[in-house]
């Protein structure tokens, strides 16, 4: 508590600031790879807590959905009996400190009280968060602060318990709220406690919350902290007592120690930085993207990153191809510990992928389009992507080979990597059909361009399958295993459709329709299945105008990269900016999936 300082946003390349309280607002979460905390603009408001890879059904007999956690950080602050809300504040300002992973707010309430507070998800404690508050009285005031837990509606039977801890120099009033998820009866527990620099009496309010009061004279400063932890049965047999222990441990460590460890670990993460000279906008955008990736993952977790990270329940928190094709590569270069966890997520779920292939009449491993914690298909049944978007298995195998190429961990390749690649290769061989001319087709798929359903010989699906089969053969040789002849035969024989002028045809029968996102253009990069510059340029010129203007931003990023590789810096920059600027949301620049 005594270590609290409000860091001013003087470094515009690391800090993102807003001061218009009435502007449209899309919040930015703080996360530590275990929990995500989403602060909002109203004083002391936290919109939701997201728990990494903790799932319940979205509705009876529906697919799994990432759950919101019980929020132990809810505070009701009053000054002279009036609730501190957005109606009587001035000088409001929020700042996201990317380097420190802090969400800061400050304002003046009713010309009586200066308020500043930090919110962080503690990097050193993956199930815990900390709110640090500092106030200064501009006039004599009576301050009261009440803490309780907010229980989202996806829970049943919430139970509140209070406990006093007075031992080893600790004087804590723990407030624990536990409940069961509505459909799968998973227990979640959240515990919180106030921490003070000096003795301050905490009492029980009429509604079973913790509350303290403080009289402040003009000019008097006062600081306190609120430490909270959220645990679930996914990670603990006894989440109730564990959430208590986390808070007790953190309180005994002390706020200064917790923050030192938090900042130390974020400094280590930022050794994996991308530095851009001469373009402040691009520098902030790239660091903001890295911040979200680092906030959503951690080394050693054996977990991956969903499309919305730990900010929301978007796409139900499932794991898609986005992970291996778009999020994994920067982690592979910048933080191999996180990249390894993303690989562990897939190798840990090889068995259900094999069971899925078996259930559809194939050999090997058929990974789900949308994977939840157990690794089974979790795509809603109204979408054909679940049964038919089969390039996901090849994407995972390609990422597996890339991890080996970067890490050169031959033991991992033998024990974990190659077994996955082998099973994917067997699936792809069993999925391919031989034509009369000896070539091979993969029929009836959903393309990477998901507007195209039930088509044959999708260029990206077939090229990804070819790469996965070729990589599996290389891995087999390194492991001292002779690859089946069928792997090479199918890889060589897979059809890649072409127009008469040499442009890659997205699928057999494609005739220039609008596409959702890049598909055939991915053959040049990252698949590197097309290497001649004139062929790459033909595909770029043909497909860029075909991309739906409201489609995902990922298309323009990969087109920009290809133009850069061709040496066309001006066009590369145009598309690079287009990949994020139209998708930025106020006030911090959070990226939406679609433009506008």
Question: What positions do the PLM features span?
Answer:
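Secondary-structure capping and boundary motifs in well-ordered enzyme cores
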Residues: 281-286, 311-322, 385-395, 413-420, ...
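Alpha-helical scaffold segments in carbohydrate-active enzymes
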Residues: 288-295, 345-352, 419-431, 467, ...
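Acidic/histidine-rich catalytic neighborhood
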Residues: 423, 427-481
């Amino acid at each position: 508590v005594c270590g609290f300082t409000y860091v001013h946003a003087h470094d515009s390349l690391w800090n993102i600031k807003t001061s218009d309280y009435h502007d449209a607002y899309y919040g930015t979460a703080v996360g530590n790879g275990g929990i995500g905390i989403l602060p909002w603009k109203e004083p002391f408001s936290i919109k939701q807590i997201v728990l990494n890879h903790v799932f319940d059904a979205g509705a009876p007999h529906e697919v799994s959905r990432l759950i919101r956690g019980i929020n132990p950080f809810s505070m009701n602050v009053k000054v002279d009996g009036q609730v501190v809300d957005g109606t009587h504040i001035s000088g409001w300002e929020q700042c996201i400190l990317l380097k420190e992973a802090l969400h800061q707010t400050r304002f003046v309430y009713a010309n009586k009280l200066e308020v500043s507070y930090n919110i962080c998800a503690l990097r050193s404690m993956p199930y815990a968060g900390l709110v640090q508050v500092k106030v200064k009285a501009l006039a004599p005031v009576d301050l009261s602060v009440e803490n309780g837990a907010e229980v989202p509606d996806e829970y049943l039977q919430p139970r509140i318990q209070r406990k006093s801890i007075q031992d080893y120099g600790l004087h804590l009033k723990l407030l624990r709220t536990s409940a069961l998820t509505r459909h799968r009866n998973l227990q979640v527990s959240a515990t919180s406690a106030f921490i003070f620099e000096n003795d301050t009496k905490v009492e029980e309010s009429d509604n079973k919350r913790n509350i303290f009061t403080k009289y402040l004279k003009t000019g008097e400063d006062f600081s306190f902290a609120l430490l909270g932890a959220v645990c679930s049965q996914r990670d603990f047999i006894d989440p109730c007592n564990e959430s208590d222990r986390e808070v007790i441990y953190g309180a005994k460590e002390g706020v200064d120690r917790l923050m030192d460890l938090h900042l130390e670990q974020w400094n280590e993460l930022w050794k994996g930085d991308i530095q851009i000279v001469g373009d402040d906008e691009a520098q902030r955008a790239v660091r903001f993207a890295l911040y979200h990736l680092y906030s959503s993952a951690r080394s050693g977790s054996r977990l991956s990153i969903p499309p919305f990270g730990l900010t929301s329940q978007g796409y139900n928190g499932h794991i898609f191809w986005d992970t291996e094709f778009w999020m994994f590569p920067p982690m592979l270069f910048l933080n191999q510990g996180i990249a390894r966890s993303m690989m562990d997520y897939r190798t840990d779920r090889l068995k259900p992928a094999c069971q899925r292939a078996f259930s559809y009449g194939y050999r090997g491993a058929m990974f789900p389009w949308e994977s939840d914690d157990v690794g089974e298909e979790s795509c809603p049944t109204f979408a054909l992507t679940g049964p038919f978007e089969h390039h996901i298995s090849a994407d995972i195998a390609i990422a597996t080979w890339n991890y080996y190429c970067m890490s050169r961990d031959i033991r991992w390749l033998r024990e974990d990597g190659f077994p996955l690649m082998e099973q994917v290769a067997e699936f792809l061989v069993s999925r391919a059909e031989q034509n009369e001319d000896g070539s091979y087709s993969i029929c009836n798929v959903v393309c990477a361009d998901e507007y195209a359903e039930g088509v044959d010989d999708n260029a990206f699906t077939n090229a990804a399958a070819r790469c996965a089969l070729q990589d599996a053969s290389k891995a087999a040789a390194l492991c001292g295993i002779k690859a089946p002849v069928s792997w090479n035969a199918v890889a060589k024989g897979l059809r890649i459709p072409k127009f008469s002028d040499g442009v890659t045809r997205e699928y057999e029968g494609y005739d220039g329709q609008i596409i959702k996102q890049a598909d055939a253009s991915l053959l040049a990069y990252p698949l590197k299945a097309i290497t001649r510059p004139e062929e790459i340029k033909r595909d770029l010129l043909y497909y860029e105008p075909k991309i739906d203007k409201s489609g995902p931003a990922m298309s323009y990023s990969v087109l920009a990269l290809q133009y850069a590789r061709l040496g066309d810096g001006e066009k590369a920059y145009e598309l690079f900016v287009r990949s994020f600027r139209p998708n930025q949301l106020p006030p911090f620049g959070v990226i939406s999936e679609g433009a506008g």
